[in-house]
Regions:
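Alpha-solenoid helical repeat scaffolds
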Residues: 16-494, 517-526
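N-terminal hydrophobic targeting signals that begin at the initiator methionine
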Residues: 1-2, 177
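Sec-dependent N-terminal signal peptides
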Residues: 4-13
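C-terminal interaction modules of eukaryotic adaptor/scaffold proteins
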Residues: 498-513, 522-524
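Intrinsically disordered, low-complexity peptide-like regions
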Residues: 2, 18-19, 513
Length: 526
């Protein structure tokens, strides 16, 4: 926890001193106990009333972490410091219910005695009973809360939480809305409502968070939750914007840094992501998630040597739980280091972890191609396209066609079979993207390999169909046009059609006046 708090201590220079516990309570109730704990500790030198409240919440944080002795000590110290703050007695009773129900009940009675009509205290007691499986007693306490103030939002927060524990999110959301209805300033209810729908109907979560932000623009936890939901949606630009606002408040933990860096990474802001990762690792160098993210970011930033060094250390943790992306990036880094056998092994492990992620097959094909294992490259890329199904694109067939084309050059026995397959794939490219020259051009190249002496002119119609597309941008496609003109010039030369042959050699000179091949051909024709 100290590591997680260090960043907050650094940030304190830039933020105001907090006069009460309100911000700590906001962070605690929004699910940020690390930040809340630091804020409460800063209040332990304030007034007795503020100290008592801070100690109660420090007790709650300890209780949530199953540190019951620490929790009890905080509750009891809080009660001694300021006996008018009832909740410390509720906390004490909550801990004692497990071992001494009679003493626990006395603690609850002492809390109630301070203000017998405080509905929120009864709700806290109900929660204590419920957490210990004493449902009848919990209901009795809740009934008292409703008797004294049926409009207290704490009632509906408690009921919503109970419904969540019973896997009834719809009912829970309704209770949280009631809490907001009775107290529009109940910021915790907005967060809880957003949490209900974030994985189901995130638009409702976003609307609720935007509502609380509109009413309370300084309520920092809402921005963090908003960033989390946008990240879950894959809307990384908005996630980055929300996290940036949250971080500007100066109160954040390493967990928050992980989320922010992740959003930047997935938004392809690798330089910015790297800075946040470095900030987090300066605080917590052993943070596993930051180590993982640093490796991914190294690869995407083209820091391949650094990434490979880091990932080899990363995989030396016997207790770590690795995921398929870890092996994917290991394979990618090994591929860049030209360690192809090890790269293939790493990618096979990635497939074993999650065969449904199609991009692994694509990377595996590249590794096999780089190692000139063309048959395996073809096999892996075919699996990639098959896994994509209807989502496959022209570019996918184009790449597979190129793998077959390359394989033909390396295997004279199977060359014709590979070239026929390449041609069929390039035909798909031409059909899917008729305005592109690539399908026809590569069909021409493939047919040229099937007719290396240009005796049959198999490539002729394909080169001819490329020219109108390429001539729309002669400067960009000068090399491709030269290839087309050269083939056709030579074809007509072989056919003794010198007039047409000269046309194409001159076309080459029109875009490349110093082209030696065209100049020599024209000399021979004359």
């Amino acid at each position: 926890m100290k590591k997680n708090l260090y960043i907050i201590l650094l940030s304190f220079i830039a933020i105001a001193v907090y006069a009460d516990n309100r911000q700590g309570i906001d962070f605690y109730k929004a699910g940020e106990p690390t930040i809340a704990s630091w804020l409460f500790e800063k209040q332990l030198s304030s007034s007795p009333a503020e100290q008592a409240e801070a100690l109660y919440y420090l007790g709650e944080i300890a209780f949530d972490e199953n540190k019951t002795f620490e929790a009890l000590a905080n509750y009891q110290k809080g009660w001694t410091t300021f006996p008018d703050y009832a909740y410390n007695k509720v906390g004490e009773g909550k801990v004692l219910l497990k071992t001494d129900k009679s003493t626990a009940q006395k603690a609850f009675d002492a809390a109630i005695k301070i203000n017998k009509k405080d509905a929120s205290v009864y709700v806290a007691i109900a929660k204590a009973y419920s957490m210990n499986g004493m449902e009848a007693e919990a209901q009795a306490a809740l009934d008292n809360a409703k008797k004294y103030n049926a409009n207290d939002p704490a009632i509906y927060l408690y009921e919503g939480d109970l419904l969540i524990s019973k896997d009834k999110p719809g009912g829970a959301a309704g209770r949280y809305e009631q809490a907001i209805h009775f107290d529009p300033a109940c910021k915790e209810a907005y967060i809880k409502y957003a949490n209900v729908y974030q994985g189901v109907t995130p638009t409702l979560s976003i609307e609720m968070l935007q509502k609380v932000i509109s009413n309370y623009p300084d309520y920092l936890p809402a921005y963090c939750h908003l960033g989390n939901i946008y990240s879950l949606q894959g809307n990384y630009p908005k996630a980055v914007a929300a996290y940036k606002t949250y971080m500007a408040g100066g109160l954040y933990s390493t967990d928050n840094l992980v989320h922010y860096a992740s959003a930047l990474f997935f938004n392809k802001q690798y330089a910015e992501s790297g800075k946040i990762i470095s900030e987090g690792q300066a605080i917590d160098p052993d943070n596993f998630l930051l180590k993982r993210l640093a490796i991914y970011n190294d690869y995407e930033s083209k820091a391949y040597e650094k990434g490979l060094e880091e990932i080899e250390t990363f995989f030396n943790n016997p207790d770590a739980k690795y995921i398929w992306q870890d092996y994917l990036y290991y394979g990618r880094l090994l591929n860049k280091a030209k360690q192809y056998d090890q790269a293939a092994d790493a990618l096979q492990k990635a497939i074993k972890e999650s065969s449904s992620h199609t991009e692994i097959y694509k990377d595996l094909a590249e590794v096999y191609s780089n190692s000139e294992n063309n048959a395996e490259a073809i096999k892996a890329y075919t699996q990639y396209i098959e896994a994509l199904g209807e989502e496959s694109e022209a570019a996918d067939y184009y790449q597979l066609g190129k793998y077959y084309y390359t394989a033909a050059a390396k295997d004279s026995i199977a060359a014709q079979k590979y070239l026929f397959k390449a041609d069929s794939l390039f035909a798909i490219v031409k059909e899917r993207v008729p305005d592109s020259h690539l399908g026809s051009l590569w069909q021409a190249r493939t047919q040229s390999q099937l007719d290396p002496e240009t005796e049959q002119g198999l490539a002729k119609p394909y080169y001819e169909s490329c020219i109108p597309i390429l001539e729309k941008n002669k400067e960009k496609y000068s090399n491709e046009l030269t290839e087309c003109y050269r083939y056709l010039g030579y074809y007509y030369y072989l056919k003794q059609d010198m007039d047409n042959s000269k046309i194409y050699w001159n076309k080459i000179l029109s875009i490349d006046p110093s082209n030696a091949t065209a100049q020599e051909a024209l000399k021979n024709i004359k």
